[in-house]
A protein has these predicted regions:
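Domain-length cofactor-binding catalytic modules of enzymes
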Residues: 1-193
């Protein structure tokens, strides 16, 4: 997704606290729903052979490593910082109120909205970097265990996608193409191979 780099990232929009939280977490999974699994491709577990083949997943017995993690404390702190910023600005500056403080927001065109988007892009990029480091560490272990190179083992990334992001996208709405800010909380965009 986004070739591993969200455009629009601006480190100046990220607090020192967020940076400090992320410094020693690069290359780590975290807890909760984050995981790393070593899986075996079974012929009876492939539901769409054409699609699986497009991703290079076609050999029964093929070993696949799947993992899920993000930007860790860095992204969490970015969200926390801007949630508080939005809560302060909403009533007076934007005339907005929400029933749940977790829904705090700011207009995208506002300084607060633009700063949040720039910081969120930094968090998305941190998540790409984190997963890249984890992938490298997994590859090193496989190479050491099997005594073969990455190329000999056929190790490669199949798919990398972020969740909990907002992206500027073009979509058709009421017969007209429009640029929209699409927020996906705990969800990802389904992109073709």
């Amino acid at each position: 997704e986004a070739r591993g780099c969200f455009a629009g990232a601006d480190p100046e929009a990220v607090s020192a606290k967020a940076i400090a939280r992320g410094l020693d977490q690069l290359g780590t999974l975290g807890s909760g729903k984050h995981y790393l699994e070593i899986q075996l491709l079974r012929s009876d577990g492939v539901f769409d052979r054409e699609l699986a083949s497009a991703f290079g997943l076609s050999e029964p017995g093929q070993v696949v490593v799947m993992f899920h993690c993000g930007s860790r404390g860095f992204g969490h702190q970015v969200a926390t910082d801007y949630l508080h910023s939005f809560l302060r600005a909403m009533p007076e500056k934007f005339g907005l109120a929400v029933v749940d403080r977790e829904l705090a927001c700011a207009p995208f065109a506002s300084r607060e909205g633009r700063d949040y988007y720039a910081a969120m892009c930094c968090a998305a990029n941190m998540s790409f970097a984190n997963r890249q480091v984890i992938q490298h560490l997994v590859e090193e272990v496989f190479c050491e265990i099997f005594g073969r190179s990455r190329e000999q083992l056929g190790l490669r990334s199949v798919y990398d996608v972020s969740h909990n992001t907002a992206k500027l996208e073009r979509h058709w709405i009421c017969g007209r193409e429009r640029e929209l800010l699409v927020h996906r909380k705990g969800a990802t965009r389904a992109l073709p191979p």
